[in-house]
Amino acid sequence: MHFETVIGLEVHVELKTDSKMFSPSPAHFGAEPNSNTNVIDLAYPGVLPVVNKRAVDWAMRAAMALNMEIATESKFDRKNYFYPDNPKAYQISQFDQPIGENGYIDIEVDGETKRIGITRLHMEEDAGKSTHKGEYSLVDLNRQGTPLIEIVSEPDIRSPKEAYAYLEKLRSIIQYTGVSDVKMEEGSLRCDANISLRPYGQEKFGTKAELKNLNSFNYVRKGLEYEEKRQEEELLNGGEIGQETRRFDESTGKTILMRVKEGSDDYRYFPEPDIVPLYIDDAWKERVRQTIPELPDERKAKYVNELGLPAYDAHVLTLTKEMSDFFESTIEHGADVKLTSNWLMGGVNEYLNKNQVELLDTKLTPENLAGMIKLIEDGTMSSKIAKKVFPELAAKGGNAKQIMEDNGLVQISDEATLLKFVNEALDNNEQSVEDYKNGKGKAMGFLVGQIMKASKGQANPQLVNQLLKQELDKR
């Protein structure tokens, strides 16, 4: 029997507001534990919540960017549960009247475009954070009350690979809107995954398992891959899948049972009595709509249709707003479009990955990168020299030409000097000369390599090719 995988994702996004959802406390990451709190966050008796209008605007902006319908009337509800980092013993969320419904995003997997539906987007407050140490636990309520939006996909995802693509696209769109940093490492983006299997052709969904502790997109994919295999083996062996919440163990790559899954009835939702419903008229919706910036799909189309970039380049460059903005600024400084794209996808990304830094944390600027690319364009600097210059440019900033000169990397373009390298290579590699004369094209490449090696990569490659052909034709 063959099974179809059905996946739905619940993504929590922390909104980048100055204050919390229902209190004036700061909502900033990284403060001393329990320093960003007040009587509302600590649930003192008699205190009343006040809705953060900026958070509502940003929830609407995100929903619009995800092609959602904005509710005319939306309300808050109490989700009741007890946990030490939830001092009220309930969370203010939205149950049956979310702010946004019926959206979608388009993803690309293996060269094909697929539309993934989004059921709803609702607002809620975050809980605090518990840290467990041995026999005791520490509670930090700085995060308590931070504004969140939860984005719930339709069960349209059919593979862990599609889930990864959905998360990448969702993160990209939200980042472009400016409503969140969407940094998983800081907790401003978190994901729970629901997965079930059903026989191909069956309409009824199988029993789902919810996966938690998915701290990176890669872990989401790995957790789903493991769970897909676990459920298939269980079903093929005649077993049944229970409705469970499971935790992904990063060290083993397996999912581990946490508890039997609760349903919404277990939370005893009821309308929040201390907050009146939101009435969102067309004028309010239009004001928010006017604030939506250019989104990744629009930029991607512009890069292909107006700048002439391949679709792959456009996709990679628009994955993050940071990279896309940097690209646009670099070409505004006069750098060649395709060379800039190649450097950002190649040398720049390699440097960032190797040093585990973000682009904006380096000393690289669009201006100094454009300066280096223009030196490559006009033949002053070879690509090989550029690779030696770039790490210092990214680490210390400055001017690429000056770095090249300070490190004795100036490209050799003097013909007399280059002829010495050329003739030395020909004298030392007579067999390659014969191979060239016999029509073996690889011989030319080998000889160029020998010359570049002898000149320590400083020979002007265009001039080397010209002089080498000239000298070969004489022999």
Curated annotation (Swiss-Prot):
Annotated PANTHER family: GLUTAMYL-TRNA GLN AMIDOTRANSFERASE SUBUNIT B MITOCHONDRIAL AND PROKARYOTIC PET112-RELATED, GLUTAMYL-TRNA(GLN) AMIDOTRANSFERASE SUBUNIT B, MITOCHONDRIAL
Classification via InterPro entries: Asn/Gln-tRNA_amidoTrfase_suB/E, Asn/Gln-tRNA_Trfase_suB/E_cat, Asn/Gln_amidotransferase, Asn/Gln_tRNA_amidoTrase-B-like, GatB, GatB_C_1, GatB_Yqey_C_2, Gln-tRNA_amidoTrfase_suB_CS
Keywords from the named record: ATP-binding, Ligase, Nucleotide-binding, Protein biosynthesis
Family according to the record: Belongs to the GatB/GatE family. GatB subfamily.
Keyword Hydrolase tagged: no
Quaternary assembly: Heterotrimer of A, B and C subunits.
Organism: Staphylococcus aureus (strain Mu50 / ATCC 700699)
Annotated protein name in UniProt: Aspartyl/glutamyl-tRNA(Asn/Gln) amidotransferase subunit B
Gene Ontology terms, MF aspect: asparaginyl-tRNA synthase (glutamine-hydrolyzing) activity; ATP binding; glutaminyl-tRNA synthase (glutamine-hydrolyzing) activity
An individual GO BP term: glutaminyl-tRNAGln biosynthesis via transamidation
Recorded catalytic activity of this chain's protein: L-glutamyl-tRNA(Gln) + L-glutamine + ATP + H2O = L-glutaminyl-tRNA(Gln) + L-glutamate + ADP + phosphate + H(+); L-aspartyl-tRNA(Asn) + L-glutamine + ATP + H2O = L-asparaginyl-tRNA(Asn) + L-glutamate + ADP + phosphate + 2 H(+)
Highest rank taxon of the organism: Bacteria
Function: Allows the formation of correctly charged Asn-tRNA(Asn) or Gln-tRNA(Gln) through the transamidation of misacylated Asp-tRNA(Asn) or Glu-tRNA(Gln) in organisms which lack either or both of asparaginyl-tRNA or glutaminyl-tRNA synthetases. The reaction takes place in the presence of glutamine and ATP through an activated phospho-Asp-tRNA(Asn) or phospho-Glu-tRNA(Gln).
EC numbers: 6.3.5.-
Cited Pfam families: GatB_N (PF02934), GatB_Yqey (PF02637)
